[in-house]
Curated annotation (Swiss-Prot):
It catalyses: a 3-demethylubiquinol + S-adenosyl-L-methionine = a ubiquinol + S-adenosyl-L-homocysteine + H(+); a 3-(all-trans-polyprenyl)benzene-1,2-diol + S-adenosyl-L-methionine = a 2-methoxy-6-(all-trans-polyprenyl)phenol + S-adenosyl-L-homocysteine + H(+). GO terms for biological process: methylation. It is an enzyme of class 2 (transferase). It comes from the Bacteria. PANTHER family: METHYLTRANSFERASE (PTHR43464), UBIQUINONE BIOSYNTHESIS O-METHYLTRANSFERASE, MITOCHONDRIAL (PTHR43464:SF19). The gene is ubiG. Keywords: Methyltransferase, S-adenosyl-L-methionine, Transferase, Ubiquinone biosynthesis. Belongs to the methyltransferase superfamily. UbiG/COQ3 family. Disulfide bonds: none annotated. This is Ubiquinone biosynthesis O-methyltransferase. It comes from Escherichia coli O81 (strain ED1a).
Length: 240
């Protein structure tokens, strides 16, 4: 069977991977294309650590880890972290930065479905941040994340809602007006309504625990978590 068409490798959009490969060398540039990820990372990390009851000593999987911004920060909290991504260049950048920082993270180039086939039920925490909107079959990713976490373990998702406001904010505003991210980063058709994500979660062993919005204020140039999931949102689930 062709590897690209096998059940564990089907869920790859090579055009999406190419977008991030092209800018991978600037992943850790605090003023570059990934500046927004660096800015929101403390909020994401804080939310994950608080909702999971801390990360120290836990086995954590970061799905769609890219250049390792979140993965490294979770390792700094004392977690044993594995980072998954299908982009070769982002993983090379992640490995080099971890080496330079003296941080231990195990980076692996494979799909989450492939990883789930080999490591089911092995993680205390699974994170999947800003990744679902970049794959052909996001429901398959949700299913695999559920398979990977231990009973009672925590799974976190973050993505973008699909509506007019999110198109204005995340595409028109962020890409074309404020130029916070490169043009073409997002495709509003791939955004995911909270009800859709919760529907996929309900078809797994996961149970919704909490949902919050991630909000950007262009006047103060700051981010915060809070009610309202019209644009960016995060979901905490727990394995039954």
């Amino acid at each position: 069977m062709n590897a690209e068409k096998s059940p564990v490798n089907h869920n790859v959009d090579h055009k999406e991977i190419a977008k991030f490969e092209a800018v991978a060398s600037r992943w850790w540039d605090l003023e570059g294309e990934f500046k927004p990820l660096h800015r929101i990372n403390p909020l994401r990390l804080g939310y994950i650590a608080e909702r999971a009851g801390g990360l120290f000593g836990k086995k954590v999987l970061d799905v769609g880890c890219g250049g390792g911004i979140l993965a490294e920060s979770m390792a700094r909290e004392g977690a044993t972290v594995t980072g998954l991504d299908m982009g070769f260049e982002p993983l090379q950048v992640a490995k080099l930065h971890a080496l330079e920082s003296g941080i231990q993270v195990d980076y692996v180039q494979e799909t989450v479905e492939e990883h789930a086939a080999k490591h089911a039920g092995q993680y205390d925490v699974v994170t999947c941040m800003e990744m679902l909107e970049h794959v052909p079959d996001p429901q398959s990713v949700v299913r695999a994340c559920a398979q990977l976490v231990k009973p009672g373990g925590d799974v976190f998702f973050s993505t973008l809602n699909r509506n007019g406001k999110s198109w204005l904010m995340a595409v028109v505003g962020a890409e074309y007006i404020l130029r916070m991210v490169p043009k073409g980063t997002h495709d509003v058709k791939k955004f995911i309504k909270p009800a859709e994500l919760l529907g996929w979660v309900d078809q797994t062993s996961l149970k919704e625990r909490h949902m919050t919005g991630l909000h950007y204020n262009p006047i103060t140039n700051s981010f915060k978590l809070g009610p309202g999931v019209d644009v960016n949102y995060m979901l905490h689930t727990q394995n039954k």
